[in-house]
A protein has these predicted regions:
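Auxiliary, metal-adjacent structural segments of Zn-dependent hydrolase domains
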Residues: 1-37
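Solvent-exposed loop/turn segments at secondary-structure junctions
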Residues: 8-13, 36-40, 52-53, 59-62, ...
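Surface-exposed intrinsically disordered loops and tails
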Residues: 11-17, 63-72, 99, 121-136
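Short pre-active-site segment immediately N-terminal to the catalytic Zn-binding motif
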Residues: 30-46, 71-74
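Active-site recognition of the HExxH zinc-binding catalytic motif
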Residues: 44-61, 80-84, 88
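Generic structural signal for hydrophobic core residues of well-folded globular domains
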Residues: 50, 54, 86, 90, ...
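Post-HExxH zinc-binding segment in Zn-dependent metallohydrolases
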Residues: 66-113
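Pan-zinc metallopeptidase signature
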Residues: 100-176
Length: 176
């Protein structure tokens, strides 16, 4: 996987993933911008874009999936929420005080965080007050990731999570 750091400010994006830029393995599918950002923000953006790349690769390798339907044409809320959750989960392993990206648009949700964290941890739920009090907890990142296969909308992903995994809080997943 090639990453390309662009030494310029970009007010609309800290980075992006485009699978088509990997044509013949020559290009960089991931571009990162805004070198003036803090190291934890650059790290988090890198993780976010790598999560997109891993999601796309998982779909390409899985028999019966459709890379256009299940990734390129998929609902932004699902694709971005997955990457946002991976970003939060992995960045906190290196930067323990990392609280996640600001909630900029409705497509970048904290649903993955809510699926993973416990109600005890919820008070610091990504440092945000709007999502406190959810009753869902205990799903693993592996479960959430594997539930993405064959999904192109949040509703399908949510239903896959509930159908595939036994969890004492799954009756509350619809509230997220």
């Amino acid at each position: 996987m090639r990453l390309k750091a662009i030494n310029q400010q970009n007010n609309s994006s800290n980075g992006n993933f485009k699978s088509a830029r990997r044509f013949l393995g020559l290009g960089s599918a991931i571009k990162l911008y805004n070198p003036q950002n803090t190291t934890d923000a650059i790290y988090a953006t890198t993780i976010h874009e790598l999560a997109h790349a891993a999601h796309w690769r998982m779909i390409v390798k899985e028999p019966g999936t459709n890379r256009y339907r299940d990734y390129h044409d998929a609902e932004d809320k699902m694709v971005e929420s997955w990457a946002t959750g991976v970003q939060w989960y992995l960045t906190r392993m290196v930067y323990s005080k990392y609280r996640g990206r600001p909630q900029g648009t409705p497509n970048y949700t904290n649903v993955v965080i809510d699926l993973v964290d416990s109600q005890i941890d919820d008070w610091q739920n990504n440092g945000k007050t709007y999502a406190q009090g959810d009753k869902v907890e205990g799903y693993t990142m592996s479960q959430i990731e594997s539930a993405l296969i064959g999904c192109d909308t949040w509703n399908k992903w949510r239903d896959n999570i509930k159908r595939k995994y036994n969890n004492n809080t799954k009756q509350y997943v619809d509230e997220l």
